[in-house]
């Protein structure tokens, strides 16, 4: 039986690297107080360097915020960037927290189809048909949870063009970007949209097996 459920590596014997355990112990005494409101500077600097490796455009350390995990940051983004009644396009099937966080912030989740017959890719025509005067943003999850689909550059460019034409914020959930197999490559959508407002959400809990360390 393959348990394809919650993305929690530890119960399935995927342990955190020894380097993480060692550094946690060595830095425990220096970590008793509050950090900067945006997060620990050295961590944000490391994220900035990762963004540079992935060719994110125009990203500086001042653009980077850290939190207790992507789930919490999704909720904070919705609270900060949505007004009551704003509509947000969300993939279906989706990661349920997106729908819940949008509703909690007073927004309205509007689900667009990811087509099982087309490798679970977003249906661009369906996305376009659901845009109204209240549409504020579009969510993409790439690599996708729960389908596992990895979106090619051509599809991402189509999504960017829809966002560009309709002045939409793009929320891109990329928590699984380093768990790509079979020689495929993950492309951050922000690298294709230097002129748009893109919020990229990522973390270490899956790729570094540290879900409980947050």
Label each residue range with its predicted role.
Residues 192-214:
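Active-site PLP attachment segment
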